[in-house]
Amino acid sequence: MPVSFYDEIELEDMSYDDEKDVFHYPCPCGDRFEITRQQLKDAEDVARCPSCSLIIRVVFDPIDFEDGDEDEAPVNTIDVASQAVAAAA
């Protein structure tokens, strides 16, 4: 049975939470789709919403997650912690 994705989203369009090591993207239900850095390293490309049944396909370059890049966030992602600091200022 084919998988039905709500959408396909570029990794660069997702927010990154450095503390939790998780990428997020807004879900229409009000929660957020989530995928971890480890899932991406394992070539997993499905981000799930914990509050509903929707899933998205994350478009990314697996080479960015090869061994040796564990301490670096992919370039061009939005750092959620930085957004919170900027919003509070």
From Swiss-Prot:
**Iron is among the record's keywords:** yes
Which protein is depicted? Diphthamide biosynthesis protein 3
The residues the entry assigns to the signal sequence are none
Q: What is known of its domains?
A: The DPH-type metal-binding (MB) domain can also bind zinc. However, iron is the physiological binding partner as zinc binding impairs the protein electron donor function.
The primary location reported for this protein is cytoplasm
Coiled-coil spans in chain = none
Question: So where does Fe cation get bound?
Answer: C27, C29, C49, C52
Annotated Gene Ontology cellular component terms:
cytoplasm; nucleus
Annotated keywords: Cytoplasm, Iron, Metal-binding, Nucleus, Oxidoreductase
The UniProt entry's GO biological process terms, in alphabetical order, are: protein histidyl modification to diphthamide; tRNA wobble base 5-methoxycarbonylmethyl-2-thiouridinylation
